[in-house]
Swiss-Prot record:
Protein name, UniProt field: Inward rectifier potassium channel 13
Primary location recorded for the protein, binned into one broad class: membrane
The protein's assembly and partners: Homotetramer. Interacts with RAB28; the interaction may facilitate cone outer segments phagocytosis.
Record's comment on post-translational modification: Phosphorylation at Ser-201 by PKC strongly inhibits ionic currents, while phosphorylation at Ser-287 by PKA increases them.
GO molecular function, one term: inward rectifier potassium channel activity
Source species: Rattus norvegicus (Rat)
Residue intervals on the Extracellular side: 78-105, 123-131
Localization: Membrane; Cell membrane
Amino acid sequence: MDSRNCKVNAPLLSQRYRRMVTKDGHSTLQMDGAQRGLVYLRDAWGILMDMRWRWMMLVFSASFVVHWLVFAVLWYAVAEMNGDLEIDHDVPPENHTICVKHITSFTAAFSFSLETQLTIGYGTMFPSGDCPSAIALLAIQMLLGLMLEAFITGAFVAKIARPKNRAFSIRFTDLAVVAHKDGKPNLIFQVANTRPSPLTSVRVSAVLYQERENGELYQTSVDFHLDGISSEECPFFIFPLTYYHTITPSSPLATLLQHETPSHFELVVFLSAMQEGTGEICQRRTSYLPSEIMLHHRFAALMTRGSKGEYQVKMENFDKTVPEHPTPVVSKSPHRTDLDIHINGQSIDNFQIAETGLTE
C-alpha cells in the first residue's frame, strides 16, 4: 500500500512530522506555551534521567566547579575577616591565630577548597584547630560535598541501569503486512529479541490514531494476538514472535485498508516485557503508517534447523516480505441431485445422488 502520492486530509499529521511516534519509539509531540517553572524543576531526578549523556556530564561537571567556587569564596571571606591576608604566614604575630595557613589570595582559597572536597590531603595549607569558623566551614563543605557525590554517583548508576537500555535490543519489523491466516485477512508484524537473555510476561497493545474533521486526534484500541496463546501475555520471549490482528468488519482497520489510497492514520504498537534478571519492566514502541503496510504480502521464513538439529533464526530475513499468492477455494462438500421415480405418470419415490469432485 502506497500513500505517498495521495493527498492527506490531516493537517496535524501532515506537517513537518508525518508520524507522532518515530520508528525507534520517540515522540515528536511538542508542547507549545507550556509553563516550565518551579513545578517542572521539582522533578530534578526525572530531568536528569531524560538528559542526553553529554548534557548530563556538563551538568555534573558544572556542579562540582560551582561547589568549589562557592566554598573558595567562603574560605577567602574567612581569611579576610580574620585578617590573614595581610600578615606573613611564615612569621605570624604572637597574638594572631591564622584560620587557614597560607591562604593569601583567592587562587589559594580555590586550591584549598579543591583539596578539601577531594580529600587529597593537605600540604602547606591546612585549617587551624583554634579557629572555630574554619572548623565549622570545613564540616559544612565536607557534608555538602559527600551529598553531591552521592547524588551524582546514584544518577550515573540509575541512568546506566535503566530498563530503557534493555528495550533497545527489542526490534520490530520495518513493515507490517496484510496476509490470510485460516482464511481470514490479518494485519501482521514481527518482533525479535536480539539479546540471548530472555524476556518474560510480554504484552502487546496498539493504538490507532486518526484525525477527525474538527482537528482532534481520535484514538482507537487495536487488539493483537499471538498464534494460539489464549492469555494476554507471552510467558517467554527468546525467539521472534509474530502478532496478528484479524481484520473483521468490526475492526477499525477494515475500512481504512479497503482503499488503494487510504486516509492518513498511524498505528502505534507498544510492547512491555519483564527482564528475567532484574524483574524490571521495559517498553519498546514503534509506529506504522499506511505506506508501511503491505497488502497481499507475508513475511519470509525465519526459523531453520542447524546441522545438529538446533533451531536457528535467520535475522537477515526479518524484514523481508514475499507476495502472497491467493489459493483457489476448493469445496469438498458433495453436490447432491434430487431424482424422482415416476411409474405410469405417478410419483412413487424420490432419492438423492451425491456427486463428489470439482464442479465447473
